[in-house]
Amino acid sequence: MKKQPIVALESTVIAHGLPWPTNFETAVSMENKVKEKGAIPKTLGIINGEIKIGLTEKEIEHLAKAKNVMKIGTAEIAAAIALRRNAATTVSATMRLAKNAGIDVFATGGIGGVHRNVPWDVSQDIMELSKTRMIVVCAGFKSILDVERTIEFLETFQVTVVGYQTDYMPLFHTKESEYKVNIRADSPEEIVAIFNEKEKLGIEGAILVANPIPEQSEIPREELEEYIKKAVAQAKENGISGKSLTPFLLSRLTELSGGKTLTANIALLKNNASLAGEIAVALSRGGRD
């Protein structure tokens, strides 16, 4: 039976990644971008301990405004349900819940990885990417991370990284880096073909589609590095670590850049949702035009 073209979307960007009302507006825009491509968006989250595969607009607004929303990876899913909490799903939790619901395509902003100056702080996202068969569309990984170590971790954990219409790893707010990708795909159909072969071979793990931010929205690497260094130093001074670190750094980057990073973040999220919609449609057709 032909599967419906469904795209999973995460909710951490709603509850912890963007300020109100930008968070709500961006979540709705991402869903609309998926629909424009002929696919069905499903934003995931947990409301009062209940898993929601497809939040309503009212539920999205609730997560966007509510206080004390848990930020959960795969490790915290069970606790959020058992304790009847409101929870926003990160990349790892969204992947696990989406796969359990039979969804194969997921769009996010950027994946987590290894933090700068804290090499033992490695995101659950990498472990989930190594285990769960899914197509994950992102703009690379967040530029606040240790780029080289994150690339090495992805390779060690056998995550298939595919540059979309690029030979270089994009870095979230920046279109390109000096780090080459081993695999390039130039169409949704090529991505689906790789996914189908992995399925046939029974190889675990995701295909991480690195989709560069649109050129008109990117921030020059040198300029961005200045903001990041300041934000990382401030996090260290304030003793911020763990799950609080990424939201803190992204918030500081918005302030330090005069809102440039926020504008870039929104642009890449919408761009990734569009590509994921195209991939989901291609997958539902079997990967051929």
Swiss-Prot record:
Substrate binds at residues 71, 91, 123-125. It holds the Pfam family Indigoidine_A. Belongs to the pseudouridine-5'-phosphate glycosidase family. It catalyses: D-ribose 5-phosphate + uracil = psi-UMP + H2O. Mn(2+) binds at residue 121. InterPro entries: Indigdn_synthA-like (IPR022830), PsuG (IPR007342). This is Pseudouridine-5'-phosphate glycosidase. Transmembrane segments: none annotated. The active site is at 10 (proton donor), 142 (nucleophile). Catalyzes the reversible cleavage of pseudouridine 5'-phosphate (PsiMP) to ribose 5-phosphate and uracil. Functions biologically in the cleavage direction, as part of a pseudouridine degradation pathway. Binds 1 Mn(2+) ion per subunit. It comes from Kosmotoga olearia (strain ATCC BAA-1733 / DSM 21960 / TBF 19.5.1). Signal peptide: none annotated. Its EC number is 4.2.1.70. One of its GO terms (biological process) is nucleobase catabolic process. Homotrimer.
